[in-house]
From Swiss-Prot:
Molecular-function GO terms, alphabetical: small ribosomal subunit rRNA binding; structural constituent of ribosome
Keyword rRNA-binding in record: yes
Highest classification ranks of the organism: Bacteria, Pseudomonadati, Pseudomonadota, Alphaproteobacteria, Hyphomicrobiales
Family: Belongs to the bacterial ribosomal protein bS20 family.
Species, as recorded: Xanthobacter autotrophicus (strain ATCC BAA-1158 / Py2)
Record protein name field: Small ribosomal subunit protein bS20
Annotated function: Binds directly to 16S ribosomal RNA.
């Protein structure tokens, strides 16, 4: 339990930031889910469109500090490879 006024304020700030980060993370997951659905359905055009929507959202999460840069790069790279493979098939 926070005792000092500054510690109590820090707790309040952390709660607000946690809520914002939770919503950002949820937003990224939603885009990834849509892309995953398009990939499993085998729809190349939908997968490409979903990837083009998801990629900036993932990178935005990096800018906002929700995801680590390398994690996001790895996700984008693997998703791009899957979309490319589906489009080629």
């Amino acid at each position: 339990m926070a005792n000092t006024p500054s510690a109590k304020k820090a707790v309040r700030k952390i709660e607000r930031r946690t809520e914002v980060n939770r919503s950002r993370r949820s937003r990224v997951r939603t885009y990834l889910r849509k892309l995953e659905d398009a990939l499993t359905a085998g729809d190349a055009t939908a997968a490409t469109a979903a990837f083009q929507a998801a990629e900036p959202e993932i990178m935005r999460a990096v800018t906002k500090g929700v995801l680590h840069k390398n994690t996001a790069s790895r996700k984008v790279s693997r998703l791009a490879a899957r979309v490319k493979k589906l489009s080629a098939a």
